[in-house]
Amino acid sequence: MYICIAKIEKLTVKENISTLLAEKCVGIAGAGGLGSNVAAALVRSGVGHLVIADHDTVSRGNLDRQFYFSDQKGHPKVYALQENLQRINSATRLTLFYGRVTTGNARQLFSGCHVVVEAFDMAPEKEWFALWMTENLPHIPLVMGSGIAGWGLSEKIRVQRSGNLYICGHQLETNEKEVPLMAPGVGL
């Protein structure tokens, strides 16, 4: 993500990074294991505005790898995440959408972003969103996660780039029974 922003701005001076990040807007499609943790990292890094979209609610099964707490069970993820992010940095502007991202609303949600992170759980959602972004908002870098929800294999994580599409992960198929969904991979 930071690579995308830095390439957009051709940054060379470290002191400019804080100012640059404070002026940027990052969209996050999905507020689960990847999206909630990316949001926390971006807020801690000083990104000025996040657009976060998700249709799900916090459940007990989310607590081992997502940036939520047990007292937030049953709450919409975007609102629970807002509460948590504001505790990190209340100056960060948050635009929230509680609902499914669709071809009918994706442009309205993400066209004002400098970078968008695809953080959906399911492969079909990832696929349509990547195709939609590259066809409809090709000027906006899209960062996708693939195969990073477990543990181990961290030495195989790579970034593959094609135009404004960045795919981060090891892109290997793993069996959830052998490598369960856990926080370590997402934290990388």
What does each of the following model-derived ranges do?
Residues 1-188:
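Adenine nucleotide-associated cytosolic modules
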